């Protein structure tokens, strides 16, 4: 049994991602804002490739990482400089905050040692949301940071974007003014609680790069704060743009504090989970006062967005009765049970405007939960799902009336032919507020492979306009993901998000693809590894069959071998054509001098002779060495 006052040993992965270095780019506005990026170093005189980076200070060897102290408060001066916040004494931590209904805190985890004694909130009559600033015409440092971050790679563009954007309005260049306008219109959010100054600002919206979220958190059967902090750092190393702490069971408050203080990305939660723990897991005992207290507790800690299942209304619950899988959302089922037990409208719906007042005092974004999402393809696009969606649209407009940022959560389990309807209806119902979907899974027959079944749907709905994709790991429906599962889920969803960016014609999306393709053709193996989403696995697979160091410079791989490598043969064809300097049109590069008539005729005769030889040898593409002369 852990001693609540004992030190906590937490080890996280630090150091540069292989083949890369952390760089900081100054905003072009000259404001002094410095934006973190990753630069992949290439061989053969090739210019390095810059990529969007979510890993925070953990990949900067110049930064000393101390998990006990937390990360530097990057945004503190920006927040205080606006003059619209006040400091006050933080709410005292109660035993029930950690799922302990009595005074005994044994079995808990050590409290974070560097907890702030005072926290921030808006001054009376003030609104500190990024949407409020945007609507007042103010470009904040957060907006400048986002603009510079989203422009990565665009300076090297040589070709026009190629894709189908489905109505998205993606500019050739992202400016701070464009970011401000998107936030003001509600088409994008910058989730940044004023009590989470450690965050590096990012935007979620369909006119920006598609983002991904990773879920972590303990459960009633597995609770280890060290493992959860490690999973957070591990997930952002591989590309998670936000992280949701879905902890249930005990130690929720303390686990969340460790995570937030060490997270450079926005942290989301589902507050109803913790509220339920405070009443011993009995949904009927939930009250507005307990829920409100939980919101303030988490707001003071610095949670950046809340999933609120306010669209699960009493009249909609009977609509799920004939479903194959009923209500599969934990938050949705909690509120449905409460509504039926009391036969009353949900207090989340009835008190929505009061929740919004709390959100704007801390700049917390709504993630309006899809508590009635389909849990099987049989239930996709049904009456209950879309009834809730249109209610979420109504609530979005109410939140916008108070300048509070909103994104909308979506399914779920949806077969491919029904996915676009989800996107179209969400845009219509919710006024283009960012869509945030869990997959969707396109089939239900692959437990153990649901990162793939959902990745297919995620790429598709991301192309249609979803702004953020919530990852699914191989453990979905089976168990709690471990560190390896987290990596697989993140990399799978980075792939889906990138595929969506390519399909939308997002400027600069192809830069990394083209660099890797060129490295592949030129047999620059290390560059291929380093440009990939997972360099370690790429090299590991290569070395399973060709482990020798010399294989890293070989002009073939184990798939085809030296004699059958199509790219090596193509290079030889190019070299031959260029050497012959003929008009055979085989050379893909421009010939630097004119071909004489005599040379052209000689080349034609030579090719005619070789064509006859090819026929004489049985029209075989490859010959044994004994017959090659």
Curated annotation (Swiss-Prot):
Homodimer. Its cofactor is [4Fe-4S] cluster. Pathway: Cofactor biosynthesis; thiamine diphosphate biosynthesis. Its EC number is 4.1.99.17. Belongs to the ThiC family. Residues 589-610 are annotated as: Disordered. Substrate binds at residues 215, 244, 273, 309, 329-331, 370-373, 409, 436. Zn(2+) binds at residues 413, 477. Catalyzes the synthesis of the hydroxymethylpyrimidine phosphate (HMP-P) moiety of thiamine from aminoimidazole ribotide (AIR) in a radical S-adenosyl-L-methionine (SAM)-dependent reaction. NCBIfam families: PRK09284.1 (NF006763), PRK13352.1 (NF009895), thiC (TIGR00190). [4Fe-4S] cluster binds at residues 557, 560, 565. Disulfide bonds: none annotated. The keyword 4Fe-4S applies. It catalyses: 5-amino-1-(5-phospho-beta-D-ribosyl)imidazole + S-adenosyl-L-methionine = 4-amino-2-methyl-5-(phosphooxymethyl)pyrimidine + CO + 5'-deoxyadenosine + formate + L-methionine + 3 H(+). Binds 1 [4Fe-4S] cluster per subunit. The cluster is coordinated with 3 cysteines and an exchangeable S-adenosyl-L-methionine. One of its GO terms (molecular function) is zinc ion binding. It comes from the Bacteria. This is Phosphomethylpyrimidine synthase. GO terms for cellular component: cytosol. It is an enzyme of class 4 (lyase). It holds the Pfam family ThiC-associated. InterPro entries: ThiC (IPR037509), ThiC-associated_dom (IPR025747), ThiC/Bza_core_dom (IPR038521), ThiC/BzaA/B (IPR002817). GO terms for biological process: thiamine biosynthetic process; thiamine diphosphate biosynthetic process.
């Amino acid at each position: 049994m852990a001693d609540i006052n004992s030190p906590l040993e937490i080890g996280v992965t630090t150091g540069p991602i292989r083949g890369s270095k952390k760089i900081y780019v100054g905003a072009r506005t000259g404001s002094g804002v410095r934006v973190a990026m990753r630069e992949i170093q290439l061989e053969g005189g090739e210019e390095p490739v810059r990529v969007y980076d979510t890993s925070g200070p953990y990949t900067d060897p110049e930064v000393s990482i101390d998990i006990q102290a937390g990360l530097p408060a990057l945004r503190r001066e920006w927040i205080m400089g606006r003059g619209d916040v006040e400091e006050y004494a933080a709410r005292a931590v109660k035993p029930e905050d950690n799922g302990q209904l009595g005074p005994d805190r044994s079995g808990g985890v050590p409290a974070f040692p560097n907890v702030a004694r005072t926290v921030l909130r808006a001054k009376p009559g003030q609104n500190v949301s990024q949407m409020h600033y945007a609507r007042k015409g103010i470009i904040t440092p957060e907006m400048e940071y986002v603009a510079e971050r989203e422009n990565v790679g665009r300076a090297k563009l040589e070709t026009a974007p190629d894709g189908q954007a489905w109505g998205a309005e993606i500019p050739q260049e992202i400016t701070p003014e464009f970011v401000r306008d998107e936030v003001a219109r509600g088409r994008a959010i910058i989730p940044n609680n004023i009590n989470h100054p450690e965050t590096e600002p990012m935007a979620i919206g369909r006119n920006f790069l598609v983002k991904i979220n990773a879920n972590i958190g303990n459960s009633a059967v597995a609770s280890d704060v060290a493992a959860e902090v490690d999973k957070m750092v591990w997930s952002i190393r591989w590309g998670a743009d936000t992280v949701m702490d879905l902890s249930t069971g005990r130690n929720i408050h303390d686990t969340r504090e460790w995570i937030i203080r060490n997270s450079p990305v926005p942290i989301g939660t589902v507050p109803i989970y913790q509220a339920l723990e405070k009443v011993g897991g009995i949904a009927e005992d939930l009250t507005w006062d307990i829920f409100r207290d939980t919101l303030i507790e988490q707001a003071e800690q610095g949670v950046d967005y809340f999933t609120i299942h306010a669209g699960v209304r009493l009249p909609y619950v009977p609509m799920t009765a004939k479903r194959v899988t009923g209500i599969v959302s934990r938050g949705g089922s909690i509120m449905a049970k409460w509504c039926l037990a009391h036969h009353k409208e949900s207090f989340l719906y009835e008190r929505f405007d009061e929740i919004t007042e709390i959100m704007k005092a801390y700049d917390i974004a709504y993630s309006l939960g899809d508590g009635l999402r389909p849990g099987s393809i049989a239930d996709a696009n049904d009456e209950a799902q879309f009834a809730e969606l249109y209610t979420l649209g109504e609530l979005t407009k109410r939140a916008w009336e108070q300048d509070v940022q909103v994104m909308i959560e979506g399914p779920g389990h949806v077969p491919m032919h029904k996915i676009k309807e989800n996107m179209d209806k969400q845009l219509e119902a919710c006024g283009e507020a960012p869509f945030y979907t869990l997959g969707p899974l396109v089939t239900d027959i692959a437990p153990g492979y649901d990162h793939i079944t959902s990745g297919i749907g995620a790429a598709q709905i991301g192309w249609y306009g979803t702004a953020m994709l919530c990852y699914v790991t191989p453990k979905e429906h089976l168990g709690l993901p471990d560190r390896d599962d987290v990596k697989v889920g993140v990399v799978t969803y980075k792939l889906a998000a990138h595929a969506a960016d390519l399909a939308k014609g997002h400027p600069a999306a192809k830069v990394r693809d083209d660099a890797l393709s060129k490295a592949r053709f030129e047999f620059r193996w290390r560059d291929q590894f380093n440009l990939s989403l997972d360099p370690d696995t790429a090299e590991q697979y290569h070395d399973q069959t060709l482990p020798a160091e010399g294989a890293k410079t070989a002009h073939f791989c184990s798939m085809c071998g030296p004699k059958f490598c199509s790219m090596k043969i193509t290079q030889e064809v190019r070299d031959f054509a260029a050497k012959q300097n003929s008009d055979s049109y085989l050379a893909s590069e421009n010939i630097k001098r004119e071909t004489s008539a005599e040379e052209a005729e000689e080349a034609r005769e030579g090719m005619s002779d070789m064509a006859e030889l090819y026929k004489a040898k049985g029209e075989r593409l490859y010959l044994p060495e004994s017959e090659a002369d």
